[in-house]
Swiss-Prot record:
Full protein name: tRNA (guanine-N(1)-)-methyltransferase
InterPro entries the UniProt entry points to: Alpha/beta_knot_MTases, tRNA_m1G_MeTrfase_C_sf, tRNA_m1G_MeTrfase_TrmD, tRNA_m1G_MTases_N, tRNA_MeTrfase_TRMD/TRM10
Chief location: cytoplasm
Gene encoding the protein: trmD
This protein's UniProt keywords: Cytoplasm, Methyltransferase, S-adenosyl-L-methionine, Transferase, tRNA processing
Organism the protein comes from: Neisseria gonorrhoeae (strain ATCC 700825 / FA 1090)
Complexes and interactors: Homodimer.
EC number(s) on file: 2.1.1.228
Keyword field contains Cell cycle: no
Chain sites annotated for binding S-adenosyl-L-methionine: 113, 133-138
Signal peptide: none
């Protein structure tokens, strides 16, 4: 997979290309990265790529021509069809399902905005999709782009050492992940649940599913409203709800 970022701050991406599982996979050649600086495509010797907005208003707007040229340059680096994504609070929310869809692609171009935004004509002519990481605003698109990259890359075969790590993550199954424990057996008076030390894989799997359902019900009940439960999940969820009713009565 080739991922390119159109950004005026290429150095920010060192954190994802050099460190952790994504950095290791990058060194192994499982995925490639290129930062494309639109300043190199500016039509002035100072590299200005922004100007005042028509109609007035605060801040500056990133101009369409240098961004368009940067995107076209990025597309030309691969024979594969590229999907151009603009990281924007106005986009559709990034979900696990969307990350899984993007992980199937071979070439992504991530457009990282700055200042007050980007000329709308560039978005209409060159961007395939706008994606948001949440209902809040940050200073630029670089951090959202890296969050999207990390979410996508961990689903690419070969990047995680154990594919089960991705399969057991929160949202991969549509519900939140279960609690996890490691040594020591006791910490500040809290012991590791006995079932996890039993060696009974069937009981452990059922306990983990029950805890996932319990945590999802407490923290993200909206996920359960959208989910079609299998019989085992229905049984465990009914058990949890019955326990809650008994506590309240």
């Amino acid at each position: 997979m080739l991922i390119q970022a159109v950004t005026i701050f290429p150095e920010m991406f060192d954190s994802i290309t050099r460190y952790g599982v994504t950095g290791r996979a990058n060194r192994q050649g499982i995925w490639q990265f290129e930062a494309v600086n639109p300043r190199k495509f500016a039509d002035n010797r100072l590299g200005y790529i922004d100007d005042r907005p028509f109609g007035g208003g605060p801040g500056m707007i990133m101009m369409a021509p240098p961004l368009h040229a940067a995107i076209e340059h990025a597309k030309a680096q691969s024979s594969q069809t590229a999907k151009v994504i603009y990281l924007s609070p106005q986009g559709k929310p990034l979900t696990h399902q969307k990350a899984a869809e993007l992980a199937e692609l071979t070439h992504l171009i991530l457009l990282c905005g700055r200042y007050e935004g980007i000329d709308e004509r560039l978005l209409q002519s060159s961007v395939d999709e706008e994606i948001s990481i949440g209902d809040f605003v940050v200073s630029g698109g670089e951090l959202p782009a890296m969050m999207l990259m990390d979410a996508v890359l961990r689903l690419v075969p070969g990047i995680l050492g154990d594919i089960q790590s991705a399969e057991q993550d929160s949202f991969s199954s549509g519900i939140l992940d279960c609690p996890h424990y490691t040594k020591p057996l006791e910490f500040q008076g809290m012991a590791v649940p006995e079932v996890l030390r039993s060696g009974n894989h069937g009981l452990i799997a059922e306990w983990r599913l029950e805890q996932s359902l319990r945590r999802t019900l407490e923290r993200r009940p909206d996920l359960l409203e959208k989910r079609v439960l299998i019989p085992k999940e229905s049984r465990l969820l009914n058990k949890i709800l019955q326990e809650q009713r008994e506590i309240q009565s």
